[in-house]
Structure formats: C-alpha cells, structure tokens
C-alpha cells in the first residue's frame, strides 16, 4: 500500500493536488492545518480513501486530535503533533509510541520533514506542503507488518 502523507498545507491546494497526481496513492493522510484543505482534497479525489486530523490552526474541538489507524498489520497514529510538544522534542511522542505499541507515529506542526526510526516505531513528519518553505510531503509504504517512510521535495523527482 502506497500512502501519501500531507501536513500544514495552509491553503495550498494545488501543491497537494500535484503530490496526488505524482504519487497516485492508495490512501491519503492529512495531519492538520488546514482541515478545510483536507476536505477539499477529499472532494477532488473521492475514490482515494482519506483520513485527517485537525491542526493547531483548525477550530475543530469536536474532532479527535489524533487517530489510531490499522494499516496492513501496522498500528499507526496520526496527529498534528502540537499536543505532544513535537516542536521541542520527541520525548512525549516516543513515550506514547512505546505505551501504545505503535509501528508509526505521524505528525506535522514543525514544517520540517523528518524520518526517524526509534526502536520499533517509525516517526515521520512530512514537513509542509504549503507556501513559504520548500514544499515537502511524505510517503508510507505498508506491506503486512512492514512499514517504511520517506519524505519528498515537491520540486524534485519522486
């Protein structure tokens, strides 16, 4: 399964669409900021399953700040990351990953791409697909109980 991971789009729908067209994913995950962007992308690509969570700039108190997904045989948590303090360290995220036996912890918020394997858990931040910085996104590959991740610059070959 090829999964496109987006975060911090901040209104830049065209960059998200470019990533979808390039990667032709089996699924899309949007990690917040902005909720409406994820909804618009889901409307544009109704045949691609999507999961999304609100970010710190989204006013969606009725929505869960994080979701636990089962992708293949993998336990994957998606969140914006601000509730786990990811701007300063991955300590809280790491404790949560260990406690919840996560195979992957996906977060955004920092606008900085990151792929890091700690113990059994893959930590992936796709960076920002929005405006201002060099746009990036993430790719997850899931096969059974194996999960791998990478980040891609939108302006480079995937």
Model-derived features: where do they sit?
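Binuclear metal-dependent phosphoesterase catalytic core
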Residues: 15, 22, 65, 72, ...
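Active-site environment of divalent metal-dependent phosphoester hydrolases
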Residues: 10-14, 35-39, 57-62, 84-89, ...
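Core catalytic region of metal-dependent phosphoesterases/phosphodiesterases
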Residues: 2-71
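Active-site-proximal beta-strand elements of phosphoester/diester hydrolases
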Residues: 2-8, 75-82, 122-127, 149-151
